[in-house]
Swiss-Prot record:
Heterodimer of HisH and HisF. This is Imidazole glycerol phosphate synthase subunit HisH. It comes from Nocardia farcinica (strain IFM 10152). The active site is at C83 (nucleophile), H192, E194. Residues 5-211 form the Glutamine amidotransferase type-1 domain. Gene3D superfamilies: 3.40.50.880. HAMAP family: HisH. It is found in: Cytoplasm. It catalyses: 5-[(5-phospho-1-deoxy-D-ribulos-1-ylimino)methylamino]-1-(5-phospho-beta-D-ribosyl)imidazole-4-carboxamide + L-glutamine = D-erythro-1-(imidazol-4-yl)glycerol 3-phosphate + 5-amino-1-(5-phospho-beta-D-ribosyl)imidazole-4-carboxamide + L-glutamate + H(+); L-glutamine + H2O = L-glutamate + NH4(+).
Amino acid sequence: MTRKSVALLDYGSGNLHSAERALVRAGADVRVTADPDAALAVDGLVVPGVGAFAACMAGLRAVRGEKIIGQRLAGGRPVLGICVGMQILFERGVEFGVETEGCAEWPGVVERLDAPVLPHMGWNTVSAPADSVLFAGMDADTRFYFVHSYAAQRWELPPNEHFAAPKLTWAEHGVRFLAAVENGPLSATQFHPEKSGDAGAQLLRNWVDSL
């Protein structure tokens, strides 16, 4: 069987080597690239991200990443955001009182968690919908690895009778926040599947198999 082609978008942010290895193990033919044509040609695009929202957006814009993501989604081509790669899909992020515009694929704001201990670092369970594709075959007590202090804490996209409702997965650390979103061709996780052991490997296999 032909392996699905996946590009890891190289825009100066993200754990590219770990993500690349994890995606290869998940059955993908992986290339790391900042070339728009290569990123548009593959079956699936992964947008990683670590660090500050503003820095990630600056790096993304430098490689025309917003346009790449938008063009893929306009054609129904799958995109997966990871950690800050999920956060930048929202309208804006607020860090230390400074607001930065995101890709605006989803409405809403990424804000600091109101939690007694930050960053939220370590293993945590999530609450996924029964019909999730990403979490298919996993138990309710499955844990994933998080490292973050900011997250989207509300889902602000209004229902639309003409489109399937997004599948929302939640987690808690001081407050409830979005741990993952599955919205047509656009999916994202706040946790790091490439650092989440067998559970993360299963999630990536599920995504690759869906391409």
